[in-house]
């Protein structure tokens, strides 16, 4: 494949992921096909976001690492010393992607390290490895372009996470602000009684203990359920099953108690 055809493969990957949930495994597969090497997309903390294998490496430690989707901390920390693309690293280097205990088997193994950057920060590392063939300038162009695309997608995913968290917080705050004083008091007692994200509640017992009417508890639960913060289901004489759907809800209740 010529450089243009290989570049188009990466462009297609970028167009596919636009506006969709990021699949780093598919991105790694595309880069493997374009560059012809093993590809590992590693986060700042060494989490293996995605990988694709061109040449199988028979080594138990490597297999375990891929299964656990986590690179060793010491190796990951070392990667951050590399600020620019470092190509064709041999197996004697501390940065080799081949198992050092099998240097004799993988003596012709070459590794290329490409920092993934975006938004003025280091987001992770793209690691390429293969046997017998060095990485050419064309390969490095594709690798750096691929790292840029991966960086854009990591930033996009982070933005989505931040937006989702902001939405969750806003929903919780709106739900709580819709409660009357007595309903809010009832809610605090309900989730003290629940002591977790889900469980059974007997409304009449709480009403008697706290000194509020059962209807206050029912109204409070109804408001929280209509806001999508909880789900509830009557189990007749056993009580009401309650499950928290929004992770921010219990945190907000705790914060209000502290205030």
UniProtKB/Swiss-Prot annotation:
It is found in: Cytoplasm. Its main location: cytoplasm. The modification Phosphoserine is found at residue 215. Residues 1-155 are annotated as: GAF domain. GO terms for molecular function: DNA binding; DNA-binding transcription factor activity; GTP binding. Residues 203-222 bind DNA. InterPro entries: CodY (IPR014154), GAF-like_dom_sf (IPR029016), GTP_trans_reg_CodY_C (IPR013198), Transc_reg_CodY_N (IPR010312), WH-like_DNA-bd_sf (IPR036388), WH_DNA-bd_sf (IPR036390). This is Global transcriptional regulator CodY. Belongs to the CodY family. DNA-binding global transcriptional regulator which is involved in the adaptive response to starvation and acts by directly or indirectly controlling the expression of numerous genes in response to nutrient availability. During rapid exponential growth, CodY is highly active and represses genes whose products allow adaptation to nutrient depletion. One of its GO terms (biological process) is negative regulation of DNA-templated transcription. It comes from the Bacteria. GO terms for cellular component: cytoplasm. It comes from Shouchella clausii (strain KSM-K16) (Alkalihalobacillus clausii). Keywords: Cytoplasm, DNA-binding, Phosphoprotein, Repressor, Transcription, Transcription regulation.
């Amino acid at each position: 494949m010529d450089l243009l055809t290989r570049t188009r493969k990466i462009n297609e990957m970028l167009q596919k992921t636009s506006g969709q949930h990021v699949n780093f495994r598919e991105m790694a597969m595309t880069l493997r096909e374009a560059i012809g090497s093993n590809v590992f997309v590693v986060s700042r903390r060494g989490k293996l976001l995605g990988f694709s294998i061109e040449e199988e490496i028979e080594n138990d430690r490597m297999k375990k690492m891929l299964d656990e989707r986590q690179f060793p901390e010491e190796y990951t920390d070392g990667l951050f010393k590399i600020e620019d693309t470092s190509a064709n690293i041999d197996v004697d280097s501390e940065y080799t992607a081949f198992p050092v205990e099998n240097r004799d088997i993988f003596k012709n193994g070459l590794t290329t390290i490409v920092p993934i950057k975006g938004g003025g920060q280091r987001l992770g590392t793209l690691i390429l490895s293969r046997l017998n063939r060095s990485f050419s300038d064309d390969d490095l162009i594709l690798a750096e372009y691929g790292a840029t695309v991966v960086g854009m997608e990591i930033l996009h995913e982070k933005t989505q996470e931040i937006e989702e968290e902001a939405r969750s917080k806003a929903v919780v705050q709106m739900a709580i602000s819709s409660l009357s004083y007595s309903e809010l008091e009832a809610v605090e007692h309900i989730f003290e009684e629940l002591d977790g994200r889900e469980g059974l509640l007997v409304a009449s017992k709480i009403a008697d203990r706290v000194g509020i009417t059962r209807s206050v508890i029912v109204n409070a639960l109804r408001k929280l359920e209509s806001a999508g913060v909880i789900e509830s289901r009557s189990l007749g004489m056993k009580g009401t099953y309650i499950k928290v759907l929004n992770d921010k809800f219990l945190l907000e209740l705790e914060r209000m108690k502290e205030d």
